[in-house]
Amino acid sequence: MSLKRLAIANLLGAATALLMASSAMAAGETLTISGFGGNLQKDLRATLWQPAADAAGVTLSEETQDGLASVRVQVQSGSPTWDIVHLGADECAVGGKEGLFEPLDYKVIKTDGFDKKAYGDHWIATNTYSVVLAWRTDVYKDKHPTSWKDFWDVKAFPGRRALSTYPQEMMEIALLGAGVSKDKLYPLDTKLSLEKLKEIKPDISVWWSSGAQSAQLLKDKEVDMMAIWGSRVASVIKDGAPVEFTYDNGILGYGCLAILKGSTHVAAAQKFIAGVVSPEIQARIPEMMPYYGPTNSLAFKVGKFSPEVLAKSNMSPENVAKQTFIDANWWRDNNELVREDYSLLISN
């Protein structure tokens, strides 16, 4: 063998060894992702996270968190034990503003099929949920509420009502109840929204603080109509309670992923997130997580779904047209003040 050929062979051998070592390192990496726990995290793991981890060649470890405050503690420690966090998009946007997250690499993560409100410099939405109007059919037999205007019409639709202790989505539905069209919601008229909430407050029997509580209120007939997550009311209906809901004037919110500042697995985390938001993996949501939806609209071109599946998905073309998306960037800039005013209103 000539020296030239020997040199080439040695180079090829070295390159192959380097590639194998790189693959082994990637396969050996463990990403820690922290979510909300419960059935939601279980469903996200099976539907999105594990397939994306397999595609990225990483091992996934899971933790739970209780919001942005726990992320701050992680980052401020200087050595976060979490790599990725799953939050609501409003908190992702706030966390990005506070410098809690690494910038996302949009050369690796593709946003084709994404609404521009569904991602930012430091976060990207990975699933959607809906806040919808639900009611008991044994209470409203002949005529039931169909809009947030009806929710505010206590004379035409008397009954016990419930809203959330969190202002996100509640501020929006108050404006819809005031007659503001869904395409004119932002920037939110917070004065009008708070006025409408003050107006309905005497008829609010319960301010719920968790998804489990909201479902139980409706199931046990403690309230007659309410604002509730679509996935939660679906479980109540599945259990046989006389309940219905509508996607009309629903508020579409996002669950998002972000990489914690100081993570030692940033490159692997970028690759993992790229997999989560890919059309192929997003197309698993309508079948596996009914009443949620993909954030990548290309999922509906990749997947083949039955009419029954599309009827349940909040992001099917028919259902998404009935709703409006939450503006995470508006909440990023106004969250603190609105939360304070809202808490004061519902507590007094």
Predicted regions and their residues:
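Extracytoplasmic ligand-binding site segments that recognize negatively charged/polar headgroups
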Residues: 36-45, 80-82, 86-219
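Periplasmic-binding protein-like
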Residues: 129-131, 191-200, 237-263, 304-308
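Mature extracytoplasmic/periplasmic domains
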Residues: 260-320
